[in-house]
């Protein structure tokens, strides 16, 4: 097991840069209403941050984050008229209005005497002729990518009014080798596919990793010693432990929103039912009791309800129940079968995998089953996971043929599907909350 201390590797100081940097009220400046669904990407000019290669790299990551969201269209630098030489000074707004830059980002990256990096940025509205916001951050040089993600989040929030999702991690199953000799390891990475680190050595099959709300633990299923069990992995130390030594197979684990429980499936006598385990007392509570396969439980963000998959009606469908197991109600009624339900962090939607007509789709529906929408369909799409702002999903796709699965992201419009490049094949992604 490998140690992973990277969650505490960054030390960021955040603050307004000076009195001149205080943001003007947002209602006087450019905004982007993303509640309307599919929106036209906003043209935004992101200049190379001053002071060498590091500054240019930071601005490139910011631009890539914003472009991948589908809400922003970074303007090609060849169109820039003004060359920013002093990010503290007001830009020539007319030069940016000519190229229709609805927003402008300037900044610099410098190295302090103690070796730390200082990254600062300013966000401008050229058409209002005003600065919108500005911040500065301090960190160790190796964490420059994370600072870029934090800045991208700040820009996203200032313009959309909602939290971003760029300063996050994704835990997933990294797959390598042939189908006959496939090696599967738990891995973790930045949400854009960079900084991949292996968490297990690949000696045991691993499936369905899930983040804890505190970002410090992962629960997953492993076939260690040929015994399929649910485990807890401490990301800081690499220490792992079994979640309950049950006589049958345990699988499909997920944390409760408060991190105090793990909800999972337990297979006994040919049936699979859903249980919770209190992580402090280690007491278990049975929530379902059917002669069927009940699996893939997922809490609502307030912890009051649970969505899950069950074939009690003949084929897999999505059900919702209260957190104590009462009020079990089927909510999926379309053609085909439904699986892997997962509740949005916003509480308004449940994402799912749907199999119909020989193809697999990723879709969303409201918690009462209404408003079903398919976002993408292919040979085999599966395992949706939500970004912490509830605006984007990640999933894995297996194409027909001899290759392996790959990770993709897509927003709720279904029009912004993006490949998330990883060093090897990837499956079973799970998005972290925003980092701190």
From Swiss-Prot:
Keyword Signal carried by entry: yes
Signal peptide (residue range): 1-28
Domain of life: Bacteria
Gene3D superfamilies attached to this UniProt entry: TolB, C-terminal domain, TolB, N-terminal domain
Subunit-level organization: The Tol-Pal system is composed of five core proteins: the inner membrane proteins TolA, TolQ and TolR, the periplasmic protein TolB and the outer membrane protein Pal. They form a network linking the inner and outer membranes and the peptidoglycan layer.
InterPro entries assigned: 6-blade_b-propeller_TolB-like, PD40, Tol-Pal_TolB, TolB_N
GO BP annotation list: cell division; protein import
Keywords on record: Cell cycle, Cell division, Periplasm, Signal
Task of the protein: Part of the Tol-Pal system, which plays a role in outer membrane invagination during cell division and is important for maintaining outer membrane integrity.
Disulfide bonds: none
Organism in which the protein naturally occurs: Rhizobium etli (strain CIAT 652)
GO cellular component: periplasmic space
Protein name: Tol-Pal system protein TolB
Cellular compartments annotated: Periplasm
Family according to the record: Belongs to the TolB family.
KW Cell cycle (keyword) present: yes
